[in-house]
Amino acid sequence: MESTWYLYILRCRDGTLYTGITIDVEKRFEAHCSGKGAKYTRGRGPLELVYRETCQNHSQALKREWEIKAMSREKKQELIENNG
């Protein structure tokens, strides 16, 4: 059986949003905060975890990540405010 995957959104110090997927949100967040996460988030801290969503598998998580990355900033904000 495949592990549960999570989609997450971080808010960076400069107000930008970073979307990613992982099987362990807390561990991945720590990696981002310590500069070992995505290149995009390095130097943009402090970071805030503002949204997480459970996905059934890796494939679903990738699909959802693509959907959210295609959203406008306004739509991402609505998602965070309504569900974050």
Explain the meaning of each model-derived region.
Residues 1-84:
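GIY-YIG nuclease catalytic motif and its immediate N-terminal context
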